Amino acid sequence: MASYPNGQSCPGAAGQVPGVPPGGYYPGPPHGGGQYGSGLPPGGGYGAPAPGGPYGYPSAGGVPSGTPSGPYGGIPPGGPYGQLPPGGPYGTQPGHYGQGGVPPNVDPEAYSWFQSVDADHSGYISLKELKQALVNSNWSSFNDETCLMMINMFDKTKSGRIDVAGFSALWKFLQQWRNLFQQYDRDRSGSISSTELQQALSQMGYNLSPQFTQLLVSRYCARSAIPAMQLDCFIKVCTQLQVLTEAFREKDTAVQGNIRLSFEDFVTMTASRML
């Protein structure tokens, strides 16, 4: 028997937490535009979202109020993943992309970063290239699990790579999660402690025990005297929690807060939703 606390309400279709459709890419919120949706962390969950943007859209300017302007996740002011090379991506050489300009429905800044990250000029971002481009606040590379999860989410062609449209959606997705990470990093340490994660999940609408939160931190954090969660693990945990919550919601057709499953149904539901 699985359950969520009484009093928590299941969101309607407009607030549906995303799964991963057969196409293998992340659709974004249902009201997002474009082939890939908006690529932002979705609205809704089991419980109301916190005021001011978590699991929805941020306050004006794209950054939750009270967040610092300095780098989080190795993302300096003016753009993610370090500075662009002088003279634009690839210096002054024409490169793979020619002079065609930014493709339709692609964020111009994301397009510039796509060109910079696409080291082999193939027109796609591989797992290796993505991992090399992403760093946490302590300058460690994003872990393989999170990078592979994001490749699977935004790889519409199931080729193991992300095209420019998928990267544009991924870029927005990363920016939104970075903003949320900043908001919940109360002590501005550059990492999320067990207490901060508990507060974050609570404000996102999840009524989970401190013991469960501590389990998440111990599972996804590097061993240290004071375990804390870097941005890559924060993205992994919150995204996976959303996906599993949606799987639960689909089974809870009576909106009673509990479901009854056979062991095989449980394993199937979990395996089919793991990113």
Swiss-Prot record:
Q: Which GO terms describe its biological process?
A: COPII vesicle coating; endoplasmic reticulum to Golgi vesicle-mediated transport; neural crest cell development; neural crest formation; positive regulation of protein monoubiquitination; response to calcium ion
Q: Provide ranges: composition bias, Low complexity.
A: 59-70
What is the membrane topology listed in the Swiss-Prot or TrEMBL record?
A: Peripheral membrane protein
The positions annotated for binding Ca(2+) 2 are D185, D187, S189, S191, E196
A Pfam family the protein falls into = EF-hand_7
Q: Where does Ca(2+) 1 bind?
A: D118, D120, S122, Y124, E129
> Which residue stretches belong to region Disordered?
21-45, 59-103
Instruction: Extract the ranges annotated as region (Required for interaction with PDCD6).
Output: 195-275
**Domain annotation EF-hand: ranges:** 105-140, 146-174, 172-207, 208-244, 245-274
Question: What InterPro entries does UniProt report for this protein, alphabetically?
Answer: EF-hand-dom_pair (IPR011992), EF_Hand_1_Ca_BS (IPR018247), EF_hand_dom (IPR002048), Peflin/Sorcin_CaBP (IPR051426)
Cellular component terms, GO, for this chain's entry? Answer: COPII vesicle coat; Cul3-RING ubiquitin ligase complex; endoplasmic reticulum
In what ranges is there compositional bias, type Gly residues? 31-45
Q: Name one GO molecular function term.
A: protein heterodimerization activity
Q: Does the keyword Magnesium apply?
A: no
UniProt modification remark: Ubiquitinated by the BCR(KLHL12) E3 ubiquitin ligase complex.
Primary localization class, coarse: cytoplasm
Region (8 X 9 AA approximate tandem repeat of [AP]-P-G-G-P-Y-G-G-P-P) location: 21-100
State the source organism's domain of life.
Eukaryota
Is Chaperone set as a keyword in this record?
A: no
Its annotated compartments are: Cytoplasm; Endoplasmic reticulum; Membrane; Cytoplasmic vesicle, COPII-coated vesicle membrane
Residue ranges of sequence repeats:
21-29, 31-39, 41-49, 50-59, 60-68, 76-84, 85-91, 92-100
Q: How does it assemble?
A: Heterodimer; heterodimerizes (via the EF-hand 5) with PDCD6. Dissociates from PDCD6 in presence of calcium.
PANTHER family, sorted: PEFLIN
Described by its record, this protein's role is as follows: Calcium-binding protein that acts as an adapter that bridges unrelated proteins or stabilizes weak protein-protein complexes in response to calcium. Together with PDCD6, acts as a calcium-dependent adapter for the BCR(KLHL12) complex, a complex involved in endoplasmic reticulum (ER)-Golgi transport by regulating the size of COPII coats.
Mind telling me what this protein is named?
A: Peflin
